[in-house]
Amino acid sequence: MFEYFYNEIFRKTIISFGTLFNDISIKHTDSDGNKSTSKVPLAYGPIGKFLARLEQSPNLNKSVAMTLPRMSFEFTGLTYDPTRKVTTTQQITVKDPDTETTTKKVFMPVPYNMQFELNIMCKLNDDALQIVEQILPFFQPSYNLTVNLVSEINEKRDIPVVLENVSFQDEYEGDFTSRRVLYYTLRFTAKTYLFGPVSSATTDIIKGVSVRYLAGGAKSTERDVTYSIK
């Protein structure tokens, strides 16, 4: 029952979620009207880790100070979703995408919801607003991610990523030497599926059919007819 298999579904979903936000930029305009564009860095990890680094190096003149704005995301939870459950005894049978001569099968997947947090950390409120406004219009309230959940059978599915809520906090406490940090937290749910092990289905394929029937009746000669297709 518990044979080894690893479809990397969690890993693929986490990576796909992160790619949604890895190309966000902000613009600044100086006093002369010149505009500059900078890409917002994105990293995986809890927000507490980044806030701790800010507290350890609050001096903006130090080369080790962490630059803002920046974003981080994290996989925070996992729950079973009974509303998307299907019959578990059914199977998906497909041709092996590598050989096209053999067939593989896998049982229907189990639905799970993955919870994510996206944290946006900024020094200026306008930077945060620029970032948030580039994200929210695409979630109404969901955005579909196409993920190849099982590469072995090329099983691609659209994974809805639902925006659950948005919260805002201003971490500006202490004296004038303290560094101000504004951050938004966006919480999402990705409705993914977990597949079990993939096995060979070549031996289960019907390669020939034979049909036999009797033709005729009481007033005619009966004929025993057999058709075979291979």
Regions found by a protein language model. Give the residues of each.
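Extracellular/virion structural assembly segments
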Residues: 1-8, 78-79, 101-113, 123-143
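Small/polar-rich, solvent-exposed N-terminal microdomains that initiate assembly or binding
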Residues: 1-91
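Beta-strand elements of well-folded, non-transmembrane domains
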Residues: 21-25, 77-79, 114-126, 139, ...
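Catalytic micro-motifs at enzyme active sites that drive phosphoryl/nucleotidyl and oxygen chemistry
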Residues: 58-63, 100-108, 171-178
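Aromatic- and glycine-enriched beta-alpha-beta binding-site module
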Residues: 82-106, 110, 114-120
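Short conserved micro-motifs at the rims of enzyme active sites and ligand-binding pockets
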Residues: 83-86, 196-202
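Short, cationic low-complexity segments
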Residues: 95-101, 204-230
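Acidic-leaning, charged glycine-interspersed low-complexity segments
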Residues: 108-113, 130, 137-198, 205, ...
